Design a protein with these regions (language model features):
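Active-site recognition of the HExxH zinc-binding catalytic motif
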Residues: 70, 161-178, 205-206, 258, ...
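Post-HExxH zinc-binding segment in Zn-dependent metallohydrolases
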Residues: 66, 175-228
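C-terminal motif of bacterial Sec signal peptides marking the signal peptidase cleavage site
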Residues: 16-19
Length: 435
């Protein structure tokens, strides 16, 4: 079946771009209109300099100066990517399409999954979960272009920081082709490794943008960034814990991973990580486990039940487990349960009406499988439309309008979630009597 870049992968890569953009004089002012051409290709020779950026009349020249700073601070050559300008709404739409919450590439199945796990209201749309402020632009790795907002006159300090991140992503993509690697991982069904790579990319960009802010911007500009971020946060709705976990993965967890690499081997260690990418989001959360602690391959069990179509499959990973457990239970309990991840495989099945998730998991130790099973049982009771758990062979079944089954055996664990109790039982019975 056709694979798609999954939920959490591109999202972790780019959601830190969400920010307000305006003029230097007034933080909340919209960019003034411009009558310039809508598409511009620019090739800039990069030189290094320690002098502060002056305020050029041409915003393209200002962005070219940012590219020079990227080459200097990130220590990678960079020609300014071809520039495409779009309307403000088109920029937001394109950005949200790039950062969309997708497991399957189909809005219907994605919405069904998020509704089933209690993230999205029954009548809600996936796009409702993504809330971003006005942005100056973003790097589109699929086309290798820098997409800018029409009428861009000048960049605010936060706009400079944001585009520095995007240009850093462009530089690392040019040097290491992380987008091609990410597509290959996704096509192979390894959603978790693709998400791990996106955490490296965004963490790299955010870390070096922080270096730029500290070394190149004035205290006044740094204070303006804080004010802009506060203004943006006030405009955005608070996301569910599931989305918040994905949002934080690149800017916070990925940045910490990059900082760990730099502390031991400098920027050369970061470049080496692109050549030997992290194999799991577990390695991003726990840098000491990179690169030796490789994930365990878990084969999905063949199913003989008829009437179901597979609409998604791959590796779920620690990131998705943390996101799933981010609401409904204590955060400390969720952290403990997700941290023993050793490997897994998941399948999303559709019978024409309802969706079923099957997750087979292997922990580092037997206690990891037990802790996760117990935690998932509590989470299902709190987050899904199910009743109290009842014994069911080796595990517990939770039934109501929806369905959950969870069991563990030594280091292994099985989880079945369904938006319909009958469909859930049909899939759960496929694992009888072993589970």
């Amino acid at each position: 079946m056709k694979r798609f870049i999954p939920m959490g992968c591109v999202l972790a890569l780019a959601l830190s771009l969400a920010a307000c953009a305006g003029s230097r004089d007034e933080i909340t002012q919209e960019f003034l209109p411009d009558t310039g051409p809508t598409t511009t290709s620019v090739s800039t020779t990069i030189t290094t300099s320690s002098t502060p950026i002056t305020a050029p009349v041409d915003p393209i020249a200002e962005i070219g100066e940012l590219a020079s700073r990227v080459a200097e601070i990130r220590e990678l050559p960079l020609d300014l990517p071809p520039i495409e300008t779009r309307s403000a709404q088109e920029v937001l739409d394109g950005y949200q399409a790039l950062t969309g919450l997708s497991l399957t590439g189909d809005d219907r199945f994605d919405a069904e999954f998020l509704q089933m796990v209690g993230v999205l209201e029954d009548d809600g749309a996936v796009a409702d979960l993504l809330s971003v402020c006005s942005i100056p632009g973003y790097y589109d790795p699929a086309t290798g272009t820098l997409v800018l907002r029409e009428g861009l006159i000048e960049l605010t300090p936060l706009g400079q920081k944001n585009l520095f991140e995007e240009l850093t992503a462009a530089a690392t993509d040019t040097a290491h082709d992380w987008w091609g690697t990410m597509q290959s991982l996704s096509a192979a069904g390894d959603a978790d490794a693709a998400a791990a790579l996106s955490g490296l990319v965004r963490g790299d960009a955010v870390f070096h943008a922080g270096q730029y802010v500290e070394s190149q911007l004035t205290p006044t500009d740094r204070f303006a960034i804080t004010l802009e971020q506060i203004s943006c946060d006030q405009q955005r709705s608070n996301p569910p814990g599931y989305v918040a976990e994905l949002e934080a993965f690149g800017p916070e967890i990925g940045r910490a991973f990059v900082e760990d690499l730099i502390s031991t081997g400098g920027v050369s260690a970061v470049d080496a990580a692109y050549r030997t990418p992290p194999q799991s989001t577990e390695q991003i959360y726990h840098p000491a486990r990179y690169p030796a602690d490789r994930p365990v391959a878990v084969d999905p069990q063949a199913l003989t039940v008829t009437g179901f179509t597979e609409v998604g499959a791959g590796v779920f990973g620690e990131l998705q487990l943390r996101a799933l457990l981010s609401d409904g239970i204590l955060s400390s309990q969720a952290l403990q349960a997700a941290s023993g991840w050793g490997g897994d495989s998941y399948r999303l099945l559709w019978d024409g009406t309802d969706l079923v998730l099957v997750l087979r998991y292997e922990g580092d130790e037997a206690r990891d499988a037990r802790e996760l099973a117990e935690t998932l049982g509590g989470w299902a009771s709190a987050s899904m439309n199910v009743g109290s758990g009842r014994p069911d062979n080796t595990g517990l079944a939770f039934e109501g309008q929806e369905y959950a089954f969870v069991a563990h055996n030594e280091v292994a664990m099985l989880l079945v979630l369904s938006s319909d109790a009958r469909a859930g039982r049909d899939i759960r019975d496929e694992f009888w009597p072993d589970w």
